[in-house]
Structure formats: structure tokens, C-alpha cells
Amino acid sequence: MSRPLTPMEHLLAKYEGDVNGFGHHAAHGELLVPGESLLTDVEVLDVYTDESRMPADVEQWNRLPLHTILSRLVKISPQRLHVNPGQPFDTEFDFTELGDAAAQHMRICGCGERPSATREARRWADAAGRRFFVVRHKDNARLRGCLTAGAIGDALGANTENLPMEVIHERHGPDGITDLPEKPDITDDTQMTLFTFEAVIRWHVLERLSGPADLTAVTQNAYQRWLHTQKTPWEKARGALSTLEEPDGWLITHRDLFRMRAPGLTCTSALQEFARTGEQASITKPVNNSKGCGGAMRVAPVALADEDPQMVFALAAANAALTHGHPSGYLSAGVFAVLVHQLLRGKGLPEALEVAVDSLVRREDHEEVVAAIEHAVELAALGEPSVARVEELGRGGVGDTALAIALYSALVTDDPNEALLISVNHGGDNDSTASMCGNLVGALHGIGKIRPDWVERVQFRDVIDRMVSDWELENSPAAPVAQEWFTRYPPS
């Protein structure tokens, strides 16, 4: 006796025509849905099975693999799924029936059950007044500001990293560093931030094509490409699991990246270990006991990966743990990414810090990072910034002190350009602290508040602008489907 059909199999039987091909359709069937973004407050999700059934004046819909839609259903939980609305044979399913079917469908197609990023969206209406959902573009002035000001801070400190203030005063005068150097080149901080951003874009492409994907694994591959730029032959940098004969993607084609700008030995040795063994480090399987700032200084783009700050914290901490195994190394990265996440969404710094600390104190071994944050806030409340107060927070070479200096500098003044100079004028790892401060104040104030001459001169400004535009396009209802795009951002 044949079993009864599930609601999802009814859908496939009615509109795909072959119930016995359920697993096949799970992997290869495509439906049209409103944009890629599905919100938690969707009550009725409209789905079309082919373009011929859609109203002629609807333009903002995307074709997605069926399993991608189902992976979203598990998280967004609409009350009803409406198939081919307005058509002679339209169908509605109650989600109380669909929930189990969607989860089962994900298992059949091997998608796993990790919720993918829920991307913020807004309502649009077609000519007939029907409402549907598309991705809302973020305030790109904030994202451009975040990444550009981060590069500026990096360049401000590039030539004076770990030099005593006495030497900085000898070179730059009694006020210390007050302007970009004549050749405002970035260091490994911005290099790795760009490869992180590339990983986020490529991960998004992968999710769009294939369903939920592991951002940390995609980022590991990106960092192996960065390792190749640091004079490591590709056959030794690519990793034991890779079969690529050459590194792929658009970012790696920029030859100016192939310069050793004081790369952190902790990062390079951890990446070399992965290349040798193929074993990815994690919080539960640390590669070392380092709490260096190299884990935190690169994670600003992880703020783009999810709407949930708790998820952003987890993703950033996992990112940092690829190379830095001490809790203060990866927890400071989690805090930093959540700060950027909140600032990009228009929150003030105190409110952003409250959200970040709430995420932090849920984790084990958070005490050292909490103490560093509290110290930074206390000093900022005193006003009157000084080198002595910056150096009271530490040298910035480890994650918690780098975070503290960046945070102090952003809190103690409302001028983002002054904040950058405060964060770079100390005798420690000042390119990293200024880069992190730049990420914060750029996200807080937007690129329009950053000195225009600095914005124009800093290295890789054109690359940052292009990648921000590409991120916007990848998140739009018109996300590219041409092979050229997948060559630019391979889904891996």
C-alpha cells in the first residue's frame, strides 16, 4: 500500500509532475520567489513554479533552487505557502504541515540544518498593489566608510608599527602622526580584511546557488589565497584538500597584494599548518594559544553575514580561531564584528557596545575581554585623550588591548579623523589599532565624514569601492547569474 503524499510532495506532484522524482526535484527543481530574502515576519510566502504563471508587471522576483527556498522556510516559518497565486490552479499550504516536510526535504538534498543568513528586506509593490519582499540595500556610505577608514588607519601606522613614541616624535614632530605618509600603503591588516570580504561575497554566491554553506570553510580558502600572496608557492599554500592548479577569483589578480607588509607570524604559521594537514582549527580544536590581534583586525566584513548579532559573534569568533586559539584572541574578534554589525545598521556606539557585550558574556573565558572593554569605557569618560591614556590600555598587540584602544579612540571624540589619529599615536601595534578604529568610526559616521584627501589617496580605495558595489549587486533582486560573475566570485 502506498504511503500518503506529504504537502511538499503534493506541491511537486502538481507542479513538477513526478512524485517519484522527489529527491531529484529537491536537488534540481527551481521556483520563483520574491527576491532572495525571506523575513521572520512573513505571513504568506508567494511562490511561482515558472515565469509563464507570473503577472506580466512583476519584475523583482528571483529564480532559486527549491532546496534553497526550503532551507529558508525552516527559519522564517510563514503561516502559509501560496503557490501560483491568482492562477486557475493555485494552492495554499499551511506551514504547520510544511515545517516537517521542509526539514525532511533539506535532509534529502544534503543541505544540513544550519540557518542561512536572514537578510533584511523591505516591502515593494507591483503595479497591481501586490506586496512582496526584496533585499534592502544597506547604507553603503557606512560600509564604504568602514572599509576605507580601516585602510586609512592601517596606512597611518604602517611605517611606525611598534616604534616608541620618542621615535615617532622624532620623525613626525611633537604632535606625532597627523597625516598619511607620502606613500599611503596598507599592511597585512587590510590585505586580510579584503580577503575576508571576498570570502563573504563568495559564500553568499554559494548559498544563493546551493543552499546553506559554511562561511568559515570558505574563509579558510580565502586566507590560503592570501598566504600565497606572501611569497608562499600555491602548491604549498592551497591546502591538502584543494585541487586548484591556480588561485581563483578577481581579488587575487591584483598584483599589489603580492607584497609582504609585515604579515603576522601567528597567521602565516597557522595557515601553513592547515595547508600541510588539511585540518581546520576551531575554538574546540585550537591551533595554538595565541591571543594576538591578527584574529580581530580582519573580521569587520563578517558583520555582513547575518542579521542576528549572536550569529555574527559566533562567525567572527570561528574566523579568528582559524589562526588564534586563545579565548581573548577570538572573543575580541566576536565583539568587534558585532560592533561593526550594529554601527552599519545606524546604532550609536554605546548601544552597539551593549549588544556586543551581551553576546560576549554568554561565552566562557570572557573576563579578560570584558575587563579591557570596561577600562576603555572608563578612560573615554574622562575626556581629554592622550597618549598616556591610550598606552594605559596596552600596546594593542593582542586582541583585547587592540579592541580596547580602537574602542577608546572611537568613544573619546565625535570626530572620526581625530579618532584615527588618537588610535595611531602610541608605541605599540598602531597600524592594527588604527585600522580597527577606522572600521568603527567609518561604520559609525559614514565615508562622508572621513577626510576626502585621505579617502582619495589610500591604497586599494578602488578595490574597496568595487567590492562594496559588488556586494550590493550580489544582494540585489538582480543578483548576477552569468558565468563572468561566478569567475569573479567563484562559489567556494
PLM features per residue range, with description:
Residues M1-A121:
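An interfacial alpha-helical scaffold signature
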Residues S116-S492:
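Structured, active/binding-site neighborhoods that engage oxygen-rich ligands
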